[in-house]
Amino acid sequence: MREIWPCAIRIFEHYRAGTRHGIHMDADGLLCAGEGLDQVTWMDVRIGAHLPTPRHGKPVEINAYWYNALRILARLAPLAGADGAPFDALADAVGAAFRRAFWRPEARCLRDVVG
């Protein structure tokens, strides 16, 4: 664990601070992705300069994976001699933001992507 922990933290830091394709953590803790003609989710159709399925913003599945990754980091941290509490705290905030942003009570389902 001590060998892979630095790599896991670098990945976390890049997502939090921002990386290519507009991927970054927003103020609410959710991940934003996509810019211009970049398609960064599994719905990556592009026909020339036209995006039939644009999903720029906060895609639901990316943020579900983000939440899960934070919980995993919290559990792995002690095995690497690190404190997992900050990851749990961020995951709590992400979970609350996820429910606010994605849950559609009137339809009883989740939104696909939010701005």
Q: Which residues are covered by each model-predicted region?
A:
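Phosphate/pyrophosphate-binding betaalpha-module
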Residues: 8-9
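Catalytic cores of carbohydrate-active enzymes
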Residues: 13-32, 54-56, 65-115
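Acidic/His metal-coordination segments adjacent to aromatic residues that form catalytic metal sites
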Residues: 34-58, 115
